[in-house]
Amino acid sequence: MLRTHTCGELRAADEGKKVKLCGWVDRIRDLGGVRFIDLRDRYGETQIVCDVNSKAYSVVDELTRESVVLVEGTVRKRPEGTENPNIETGEIEVVAERIEILSLADPLPFYPGETPKEEMRLKYRYIDLRSERMKRNIILRYRISKIIRDYFDELGFLEIETPFLTKSTPEGARDFLVPSRLRPGKFYALPQSPQLFKQILMISGFDRYFQIVRCFRDEDLRADRQPEFTQVDVEMSFVDVEDVLNVSEGMVSRVFRESSGIDLKVPFDRIPYDEAMEKYGTDKPDRRYGMELRDFGYAFETTEFKVIRNVLDEGGSVKGFIVPGFASEMSRKKGEELMERMKELGLGGLIWFKLDGGITSPHLKHLEKEFRKIAETENMNEGDVCLIAAHTDRNLLNEALGTLRLEIGKEHFSHLAKGFDVLWVVDFPYFEWSEEEERFVARHHPFTMPVLETLGDDYTKVRAKAYDLVINGYEVGGGSIRIHRRDIQEKIFELLGLSEEEAQKKFGFFLEAFRYGVPPHGGIAFGLDRLVSIIAGESSIREVIAFPKTGNGVCLLTGAPAEVDERQLRELRIRIEEG
């Protein structure tokens, strides 16, 4: 080894030792007859002292920031009053006898700890990863992964690898396709998840499986998504919903406790899907902001206000929420901004009033009676604001109000976004309508066990034995009890519009396995990137991934995706069409 110690290791007890340190030059200070170097590696920082009479003194003239050097010297205590309590090695310094330049650095486009635009950080990721923030996040990610592995190992789970080159089963997002050179015209797909393989492992008798695995989705990247991501994949045989939730809560609570000293309240709260949509307008609720959605229909039963009357006469709904202490912010201009936002979200507009020395509203002339009833029923206080909307589509109304609630919470009540709001959303509908495909699709995936009592030809009534873990408004995990009976699986395919021939073509290998003994089983997958980002306090998962892609799926470090050699394309019998 070139070094005897790391830059975060030496203490006062090491005084007098001859040591060799290697690292990056973080800072250089020249105080005349003595020069100081702050030498840094991933373990910490050590102050190097170069006296004017030492051979090391002149070498400092050649050094630049971020050069890599080897330092030989002797440990001594810092003079009294010069200790640095902000670093672990702050009691000591190393008096340099020799400095060897291992790699001289050119001027950098930016220096560790600086925060240029994200594109620059991703292009020069090797510089960005030297910062304390990124170092802390990457080490945290490793520790969380180790905690997870230890937890499942103690419970008797086996970590089993599943294939990356598999068959395309186009359900949900698009697959990344990999052409086969040996079988022209045939393609592998990179897995969106190991779903079928982990179920086959249950059929194979491996009753407790987990894997920290890369997954791939070729989808239009919404905010803070990655085309390749890491999930903690879990599957168990002979279990019901309670078993999966208990094991999951044990893992998540242990990760928080051992990685960050945070104790979560176990068991986690559970909210049925319908309740989440009614109260928060989303199946990923963040309850820290309060402001639950309320049904204000009771106040408008006899209203003559035309806009709302028409909605109610058509069977629609009137809902809204109270924003506490928001009156000082709620000017007419702010009201107009919120009204425009609701139109963007698909509603006709917004009605509002506030308690500000009495009821104040642009709509007071027409709705004073209704406003007073709401204020009394909801026990509104001076300074509160009530936001109200109406629509014939209750789902759209809930979603629009839920979005507005969250936007107001994040913009004006960020001080409430502390701690961790952890909950399960359960009792999901099995199907949802896809506008793009103009048909019902499985909300989770078509291998989820339905609640048998609800299984019939009415898509809207079928419920799934599915569950999502939500932390601070982010979906961190999702899973279900799986179908283990072939007749039920065929019924689900039928409801999804898959003919027997199509089902065999896509999933024949899987359905074949159903003939030979399938245990009841269930599982869950956690998004490791999201889990780490929440614990790290980062708003973007890119901050906890060593080499992430941009929002449009580009690796700025390597330039991927990129053109390939024409010869490679010919071997694969692929031709690129222009336009």
From Swiss-Prot:
Record GO biological process: aspartyl-tRNA aminoacylation
Protein's recorded name: Aspartate--tRNA(Asp/Asn) ligase
Organism field: Thermotoga sp. (strain RQ2)
Residues annotated for L-aspartate binding in this entry: 171, 217, 444, 482
Annotated function: Aspartyl-tRNA synthetase with relaxed tRNA specificity since it is able to aspartylate not only its cognate tRNA(Asp) but also tRNA(Asn). Reaction proceeds in two steps: L-aspartate is first activated by ATP to form Asp-AMP and then transferred to the acceptor end of tRNA(Asp/Asn).
EC number in record: 6.1.1.23
Catalytic activity: tRNA(Asx) + L-aspartate + ATP = L-aspartyl-tRNA(Asx) + AMP + diphosphate
Region (Aspartate): 195-198
Gene that encodes it: aspS
One Gene Ontology molecular-function label: aspartate-tRNA ligase activity
Location relative to the cell: Cytoplasm
Taxonomic path: Bacteria, Thermotogati, Thermotogota, Thermotogae, Thermotogales
Annotated S-S bridges: none
